[in-house]
Amino acid sequence: MTQSRSATPGPSLDFERELMELETRLDDIRRFAEENNVDVSTQLAEIEARAAELRRDLYANLPPKDILQLARNPKRPSTLDYIQLLCEDWVELHGDRLFGDDLALVGGLARLGDHPVVIMGHQKGRDTKDNIQRNFGMPQPEGYRKALRLMDHANHFQLPIIALIDTPGAHAGVDAEQRGQGEAIARNLQHMFSYEVPILCAVIGEGGSGGALAIGVGNRMLMFEYAVYSVISPDSCSVILWRDKKHIEQAANALKITARDLKQLGIVDEIIPEPSGGAHRDPQRAAANLKEALLRHLDELLTLDGPTRRTQRYEKFRAMARFQEI
C-alpha cells in the first residue's frame, strides 16, 4: 500500500506568504508555551482569529494563476492517496499487454461504498526520484492502453468506471509518438463513448489537454474547487502565442481553466469543495467530499439502463461546442 502524502501544507506559494508567516508564528508560540508551561491562550486566540480571517479572504476569490499554483502543489493528494482514502479491497493491475507498464497511470479493481468498481488515474511522483519513475504524471501510449484494457474489463463485467485526472498532459516525446501516442488517446475516446457502464470522472489537480481527456469521457465530470482543466497549459499557451512565459497570467485568464468558469460553460457538472487552503491541508476531508459526490452520482447513473447511459454521454459532449462556417 502506498504511503499517503502528509497533510502538512509544505512550502508556501507566492500568494500565501503572509498566511504562512502567521501560521509559523502560531507554531512558535505553541512550542514556547509547551516548553515553558505558560498560558498564552489569549494571544493564540487573537492570532488564530486573524489567520482564519486572512485565510477566508485569501481563498475566496483566487485568480486563475493562483489556482494553477494550488493545483500543482506537490503536497496535493494524488490518485493513489485518494484510492486509499476512498476505497476498500484495492487491487492494482499492471501493463498494457503490448509494451510495458506505465507508472504515470495507475488503475485496478476496488470497492467504493457498496459498489465494485474499476478505478484509475494519473499518478505524479512525491520527490525527484519518484517523479522520474512516474514521468511527472505524463503517460506514454502504454499508459493509455493500460487504461483501455481496464475499461474494457469494466464494461465486460458491468463494473462502473472511476477516472481521476491529474496530469500536465500526455508525454510529448519522440518515443511516445513512435509508439502511437495519438492513436492510443483517440482509441480511448472511441471506446469510452461506446461503453454502457457508468463512467465518473473527477479532476483532482491538473487536467491537461488530450492527456486528461483520454480518460475523461464520462457521464459526469466532477472537479475540485482548486483544480484546473484546459486544452493547453497556460505556460505552453504563453510560449506559443507570445514566445515567452511572461504572459502566463493573461493566458490563464483567457483559457477559462478554473472549476467556476468550466461549470458556467457546462463542461463540469459539479464543483467539489476543498478544505480552506486546498486539499493538501486536509486530505481526509477532501476525500470525504469526493466520495460523497461520486457515490451520489453513481447511484443516479445506476438507475438508468446501459443504452441510456451511453446516449447521455455522447449527447453531453456533442452539446459542449458548435462550429460555424464563415
Curated annotation (Swiss-Prot):
Regions annotated as coiled coil: none
Cited InterPro entries: Acetyl_CoA_COase_a_su, ClpP/crotonase-like_dom_sf, COA_CT_C
GO biological process: fatty acid biosynthetic process; malonyl-CoA biosynthetic process
UniProt GO molecular function: acetyl-CoA carboxylase activity; ATP binding; carboxyl- or carbamoyltransferase activity
Occurrences of domain CoA carboxyltransferase C-terminal (ranges): 46-300
Swiss-Prot/TrEMBL keywords: ATP-binding, Cytoplasm, Fatty acid biosynthesis, Fatty acid metabolism, Lipid biosynthesis, Lipid metabolism, Nucleotide-binding, Transferase
EC number: 2.1.3.15
Catalytic reaction list: N(6)-carboxybiotinyl-L-lysyl-[protein] + acetyl-CoA = N(6)-biotinyl-L-lysyl-[protein] + malonyl-CoA
SUPFAM superfamilies in the record: ClpP/crotonase
Family to which the UniProt record says this protein belongs: Belongs to the AccA family.
Primary role: Component of the acetyl coenzyme A carboxylase (ACC) complex. First, biotin carboxylase catalyzes the carboxylation of biotin on its carrier protein (BCCP) and then the CO(2) group is transferred by the carboxyltransferase to acetyl-CoA to form malonyl-CoA.
Protein name listed in UniProt: Acetyl-coenzyme A carboxylase carboxyl transferase subunit alpha
Protein species of origin: Gloeobacter violaceus (strain ATCC 29082 / PCC 7421)
Protein's gene: accA
